[in-house]
Design a protein with these regions (language model features):
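A general structural signal for alpha-helical elements within enzymatic catalytic domains
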Residues: 38-45, 130, 163, 212
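Short, glycine-/small-residue-rich phosphate/pyrophosphate-handling segment
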Residues: 138-180, 195-198
Length: 225
């Protein structure tokens, strides 16, 4: 029996940080993001003769685009993508983020739905980096919404976006509706019997299977085309 630690990068999709006029959390996604991080940190899954765990890095647009953040100089407007710089000339924070993405084995995207699509902060953050950093690695999609639809239209929009980057998405989705009724701000669960919670393990099982399969193929073939 052996163990394998997957380097897992989580991209948070929304940069919105203001309470709506009708009240509630200033950032609806904080709870589900914290929960996903906790679940990844404690996860130990059996896959064949391997025990799979996760080493997690989170990229949040509130941090990434903030003053001093990895992409602060370029900004959410995507003025200077990483792949436009010559080797060694990208800002240090951007280069460090690029190397983390390059070293990742798989990705999870946790995002809200904006106008039946994905948030601009997410497409800008991930789009700062070329497909060579994402390719031949799987991704999992987790969406959320205060509505009954669970951000499912963002999930649909994400599939071609992730495919173009090269990090093909697992078929299973995690779409969490009425998300404020499921999670507290700190990621604790309000009702452990909520059946929506069962979505995440299904997504992770597929992402882990794909990640290990792709890693083994790269090891066998000595690289990717």
């Amino acid at each position: 029996m052996t163990s394998r630690v997957l380097k897992t990068v989580v991209f948070m999709g929304s940069a919105r940080d203001i309470s709506p006029p009708w009240g509630g959390s200033s950032r609806l996604g904080n709870g589900i993001l914290a929960w996903v991080k906790t679940e990844l940190a404690k996860r130990s899954a059996q896959l064949g003769d391997e025990t799979i765990t996760h080493e997690v890095t989170v990229f949040d647009p509130l941090d990434v685009f903030a003053p001093g953040g990895a992409l602060a100089e370029s900004g959410a407007e995507l003025k200077t993508p990483h792949f436009f710089f010559k080797a060694g000339e990208a800002p240090a924070g951007m280069e460090a983020m690029a190397q983390t993405i390059k070293a990742a084995d798989c990705f999870l995207i946790v995002t809200a739905e904006y106008n039946h699509s994905l948030p601009p902060a997410l497409s800008s953050m991930m789009g700062h980096f070329g497909g060579s950093l994402y390719k031949f690695k799987p991704s999992g999609i987790i969406t959320y919404s205060p509505s009954p639809y669970g951000g499912s239209r963002a999930a649909v929009a994400l599939r071609p976006f992730l495919s173009e980057l090269g990090c093909l998405s697992a078929s299973k989705l995690g779409c969490f509706s009425m998300v404020g009724d499921i999670f507290n701000e700190d990621g604790s669960v309000k009702d452990e019997s909520n059946r929506q919670l069962k979505q995440l393990p299904g997504v992770l099982e597929q992402v882990e299977w794909l990640a290990v399969a792709m890693l083994k193929q790269k090891e066998a073939c000595g690289g990717c085309p």
